[in-house]
Amino acid sequence: MSRLSIHPEGSTNATSPAEPLLESDDPAVIKVELAKRGIAFQRWPAKVKLDQNSSESDILAAYAVEIARVQADGRYPTVDAIRITPDHPDREALRQKFLDEHTHAEDEVRFFVEGCGLFCLHIGAEVLQVLCEQNDCINVPAGTRHWFDMGSKPQFCAVRFFDNPEGWIANFTGDAIAERFAKLP
């Protein structure tokens, strides 16, 4: 189930965050709270059951209608699919790469068609932890400080939309704030 926790960024303890200001697993509450902070959150039906051996092109073909809908306005000409499983040979390196706080020059749009991942958004004096699961689509605007955790045994597949042909390019902030917040097991 999708979940939102909102924490103040500060804490009297250097190794853990302050108690959450809000916690909810209600998609309507999640959508409203994120929208107040400029983050789009929608629930889309992940209608297609993918085979574990589905290729990237199979995944993109299965969600061609949804992809076309997002790409219709021309903002996101580049799309790919990422699938990380517990036996993925690069899972640890990929997890580490996403765990440090960073920004992007473009929006980060993800539609989860399987599994889950934890987006942590550092907005103003708050950190919003958004557990995205199957059927969730999140749009993190360009310049938003954030990090992403897929867990030590990741299991997710997401369609990713980009407004540049290079795809995922991070600008790391150097802030160690992510170390104070819970990660997925």
UniProtKB/Swiss-Prot annotation:
InterPro entries: ARD, ARD_bac, RmlC-like_jellyroll, RmlC_Cupin_sf. One of its GO terms (biological process) is L-methionine salvage from methylthioadenosine. Belongs to the acireductone dioxygenase (ARD) family. Keywords: Amino-acid biosynthesis, Dioxygenase, Iron, Metal-binding, Methionine biosynthesis, Nickel, Oxidoreductase. The lineage of its organism: Bacteria, Bacillati, Cyanobacteriota, Cyanophyceae, Synechococcales. Monomer. The keyword Glycosyltransferase does not apply. The record marks 101 as: May play a role in metal incorporation in vivo. Fe(2+) binds at residues 102, 104, 108, 146. Its EC number is 1.13.11.54, 1.13.11.53. Signal peptide: none annotated. The record marks 107 as: May play a role in transmitting local conformational changes. Its cofactor is Fe(2+); Ni(2+). Ni(2+) binds at residues 102, 104, 108, 146. Binds 1 Fe(2+) cation per monomer. Binds 1 nickel ion per monomer. The record marks 110 as: Important to generate the dianion. It is an enzyme of class 1 (oxidoreductase). Pathway: Amino-acid biosynthesis; L-methionine biosynthesis via salvage pathway; L-methionine from S-methyl-5-thio-alpha-D-ribose 1-phosphate: step 5/6. It catalyses: 1,2-dihydroxy-5-(methylsulfanyl)pent-1-en-3-one + O2 = 3-(methylsulfanyl)propanoate + CO + formate + 2 H(+); 1,2-dihydroxy-5-(methylsulfanyl)pent-1-en-3-one + O2 = 4-methylsulfanyl-2-oxobutanoate + formate + 2 H(+). The keyword Amino-acid biosynthesis applies. One of its GO terms (molecular function) is acireductone dioxygenase (Ni2+-requiring) activity. Residues 1-22 are annotated as: Disordered. Catalyzes 2 different reactions between oxygen and the acireductone 1,2-dihydroxy-3-keto-5-methylthiopentene (DHK-MTPene) depending upon the metal bound in the active site. Fe-containing acireductone dioxygenase (Fe-ARD) produces formate and 2-keto-4-methylthiobutyrate (KMTB), the alpha-ketoacid precursor of methionine in the methionine recycle pathway. Ni-containing acireductone dioxygenase (Ni-ARD) produces methylthiopropionate, carbon monoxide and formate, and does not lie on the methionine recycle pathway. This is Acireductone dioxygenase.
